[in-house]
């Protein structure tokens, strides 16, 4: 077990023990790299990697919808519970309910930027029938400038990388490229991921790649993107009927060293004192998965995550996405479902994402000829 804040060189050596979780090169790549193969030899047919094969849904339509609503509503509930302890040192205070307050003096049930950005993402899918980069960037700008999709009509709690990206979009439009530096690997794109997972729930490969695209609007650092991909894969499993053990089991995935170590499940052996809850995306994802793993219901997962403090709203929002996808709205405390702001609107958006979800991955048809 290793500290994920260890130096890169040490982590690169350490992660070799999980080489069995890295995908093998495709047959097409192996052929291109084989110097014994003639240049004019017939190309290997394109085939989808096994590790990107989707999980068959084992839920009834009603159960699947319950989990889809749970993923998006769970994000908002986690955000609303966690904001009470946002920016506080761990254990200075504790929370055992949805009580509001915190640095922004919110009413009980109100949430922060995590949910606002997720609602902008959901609106993009619903209005366009797909993810559209410019539509999403402009939705975020309307939130940033005018408070659209904010619980109190104004933008607050926006992260530095997100602000920098939106200012870049306003200056340069589609030509803006930024936030690639490792120092910008904040959690701003993972905390809003649920709409992508719901809309693309029928296809693991679509969830995997579209989590990259939605992240790239504000966060392009490798670890920010890679952590989105890992959570997207886990949400795909949960939304299609997996239980906690299957969802959080190590799996073959193409990941950088720190996300790979999280994928391998080392957080399952860590104590609370070994878990960080900062806004660094690696810390946020590890803390969220630790909270889900060490609980057996939605309520306890949210409180475990929120009481880690520091970036408590984002850790709890990330945990809430996965716990909501595992336990559904039916597994949430009814008083939280009722109290969280915009509850019915959020559930309605989740239903629209669910109903409009494509049955096939268009990229599969392009790459592998599948219809």
From Swiss-Prot:
* Cofactor binding note: Binds 1 Mg(2+) ion per subunit.
Which amino acids does the record list as binding Mg(2+)?
112-114, 157, 313
Annotated region described as N-terminal extension, given as residue ranges: 1-61
The alphabetical list of record keywords is:
Hydrolase, Magnesium, Metal-binding
Give the EC number(s) under which this enzyme is classified.
3.2.2.19
Q: Which SUPFAM superfamilies match?
A: ADP-ribosylglycohydrolase (SSF101478)
An example of a GO molecular function for this protein is: metal ion binding
Which residue ranges are recorded for the region named ADP-ribosyl hydrolase domain? 70-362
Pfam families the UniProt entry points to: ADP_ribosyl_GH
Question: What are its cofactors?
Answer: Mg(2+)
What reactions does this protein catalyze?
N(omega)-(ADP-D-ribosyl)-L-arginyl-[protein] + H2O = ADP-D-ribose + L-arginyl-[protein]
- Check the record and name the InterPro entries matching this protein: ADP-ribosylglycohydrolase (IPR050792), Ribosyl_crysJ1 (IPR005502), Ribosyl_crysJ1_sf (IPR036705), Tri1-like (IPR049650)
**Free-text domain note:** The N-terminal extension probably forms a projection that reaches into the active site of cognate toxin Tre1-Pp where it occludes the active site.
Q: Which NCBIfam families match?
A: ADPriboarghdlase
- What role does it play? Immunity component of an interbacterial competition system (also called effector-immunity systems). Expression in E.coli neutralizes the toxic effects of non-cognate S.proteamaculans effector protein Tre1 (Tre1-Sp); cannot be co-purified with Tre1-Sp from E.coli, suggesting they do not form a stable complex. Probably acts as an arginine mono-ADP-ribosylhydrolase, mediating the removal of mono-ADP-ribose attached to arginine residues on proteins.
Q: What is this protein called?
A: ADP-ribosylarginine hydrolase Tri1
Gene for this chain? tri1
